Amino acid sequence: GTLSVLGADAARAGSRPDAAVRDATQQYATTGKAPVIERSDSVVYPFGESQPVLQCTPLRACDVELEAGEVVHGVALGDTERWISSPLYSGDPDALVPHVVVKPRDYGITTNMIVTTTRRTYHLNLVAPAKGKTDETDGAYLRRLRFYYPGDVVEQWSDAAQLEATRANRQSEATIASLTGAMNPGRMNFDYSL
């Protein structure tokens, strides 16, 4: 089923399947629209569906977590004078999770960031709110931004469904072929009486 494919991806990534991501991916498969998932510790964006906005404040590090197994090729900041970025990795050596840590040097600034990896290119907007808008409870500080990949998962579901249809078709053809061989008139015995 569809959940087992997503579960296999999550296992490969070294994490448990996430019910909110499963539900959001199901919604994407049905409607073509993938929602942003908001949590207390992070915001999870559907890759390729919108341009994420990461709000960071000076003296705080913000984490952009990418898909396990990706390797960061490069990080480009629009404003390298007032923003700092550092690629990092976490997790098991066989399924490293790439992160890009971002810090603004000042208040009231914005820029963009492009991250290229072995699998995709990420485009993000970075915002450091004006001074005085830095209380973590007002939403001005986002510790962690993550992604889920509904297009990839739906494609895997489609591939799995096609594979299952091909298997069923081959099984049906094999059954017909075995019956056809049994019904070969040249191999039938007509020398009998009642």
Predicted regions and their residues:
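A general "mature secreted/periplasmic domain" signal
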Residues: 1-194
